[in-house]
Amino acid sequence: MDKGAVSPLMLKAHNDAMREGYILQVEDSADDAALTRHALRRANISNRVELLKDGVEALDFVCRRGKYSDRDAGDLPAFVLLDLKLPKVDGFEVLKNLRENERTASVPVVIFTSSREEKDLRKAYELKANSYVRKPVDFDRFTEVIRQIGSYWLSLNETPYEGRK
């Protein structure tokens, strides 16, 4: 077996350790969304990804409004992968609403953005983001970063709620 290969036993242990639940991705770039799904598959992370394409749709989903009004109140994601530069309502407003909503206040939120602005980093943490990760431009690095994010939030991190489906 080559040095970088993963044994079937290690792969089974990795998959067994992955928490059930879905990833809520709020991303307006179809390319970045597709790349994220591809990276998760390459990392053997098979959790469902619920993709929302703008801030208004994300707020409707989280607040169970409009076409999402009949969502189960206990249906919470394992974590949220949130872009900042979104149409209609930006990622900061989505994050603020997640934190102000008692039901979603403890859901982990990973800011995943191309922003290099120090003020964005600072504001994300002021609004209680759990993590701030800059999107790598390089494909292999992007894939590795998504693998690390998924592995951490789905297998190592523990949350105080049981609402995962």
Model region roles, listed by residue range:
Residues 21-31, 36-41, 80:
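Conserved acidic segment of CheY-like receiver
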Residues 57, 137-150, 158-162:
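C-terminal output helix
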Residues 67, 92-105:
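Short amphipathic alpha-helix used as the core "switch/output" element in two-component signaling
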